[in-house]
Amino acid sequence: MHARGPHGQLSPALPLASSVLMLLMSTLWLVGAGPGLVLAPELLLDPWQVHRLLTHALGHTALPGLLLSLLLLPTVGWQQECHLGTLRFLHASALLALASGLLAVLLAGLGLSSAAGSCGYMPVHLAMLAGEGHRPRRPRGALPPWLSPWLLLALTPLLSSEPPFLQLLCGLLAGLAYAAGAFRWLEPSERRLQVLQEGVLCRTLAGCWPLRLLATPGSLAELPVTHPAGVRPPIPGPPYVASPDLWSHWEDSALPPPSLRPVQPTWEGSSEAGLDWAGASFSPGTPMWAALDEQMLQEGIQASLLDGPAQEPQSAPWLSKSSVSSLRLQQLERMGFPTEQAVVALAATGRVEGAVSLLVGGQVGTETLVTHGKGGPAHSEGPGPP
């Protein structure tokens, strides 16, 4: 697993949130804290025990359940955290753990006592898989993404006695509600995530090793980095290339379309300074949306430069006779100068002497259209005689 460093380099690092969850669950198991985190509805009447609605996901009382939860975190949780970012992954995990716990307590209050009374992280795994698997995306391979949580729901009771089946089902239902947008009003805004990531703590964790906070896709930390012409790497990588891992293991889509393959601008007249942005390369770990957005932007710029319509010839300039003094214009006309050229010369100098100097020197052309009023060239007199 690779994470992007503070200057864009890649270094081997593990996703922070899912790795810390593994350490925390293992530590709680070793110290025997699992029974103290059981989701017991009768204990929730005590205000100091309400934390069980959330912390029940961290405790385990059976070793097979702990091993299954730990196995799914590196195989599924790491990919989810890379796709969502550390902050959004933590928010989604906590939200789904709370939702599944509330649903289990509700079912227990309705008489289904087996829906609660246990603990474990498997309901959160099922909720995260269900929430991601039901998003609109083309399935890849023989196993559709939406089928994975249902298969896991059927296999988990065969591998471990905790949590009970109804509690697992509550996690799956919470994930389906999450995918349907039931918790959208609880989602943090992009601005809020950006403010958090720019804080001192998040910036410090983003540069740590071997555990690293991953930036949320769409934030400034995910934008491509350009270098000035003098300090760019000598051999920049091809632009717009998304990570093969994200294509194959998480996006569950077909091979990238031809439009996402590396394209180099080839139009004429482009200088090195004008193409500094073209040297930005996407490193492994870049999400698909970033490569797609950058590719669409580059192709739009290239198409506008290559296939843009030819500029229409500029229309001839026009000048109104009312913009100059009629008395001075009459003086020039009595001297024998054409009216159109006299108007232009007077407009340029404002004085008869200066206008005569321009006209005698032949410095006034015949391209300007002169109008009688303040309108456009529709009332033009046309150029005067040579």
Swiss-Prot record:
GO MF: serine-type endopeptidase activity
Broad class of the protein's primary localization: membrane
Gene3D superfamilies named among the record's database cross-references: DNA helicase RuvA subunit, C-terminal domain, Rhomboid-like
InterPro entries given in the database record: Peptidase_S54_rhomboid_dom, Rhomboid-like_sf, UBA, UBA-like_sf
Domain UBA, chain residue ranges per copy: 324-362
BP term (GO), one: regulation of acute inflammatory response
Highest taxon listed in the record's lineage: Eukaryota
Lipid bilayer topology: Multi-pass membrane protein
Gene Ontology cellular component list: membrane
Keywords recorded for this protein, A-Z: Membrane, Transmembrane, Transmembrane helix
Membrane-spanning ranges: 20-40, 58-78, 92-112, 141-161, 163-183
Localization per Swiss-Prot or TrEMBL: Membrane
UniProt name for this protein: Rhomboid domain-containing protein 3
Gene: RHBDD3
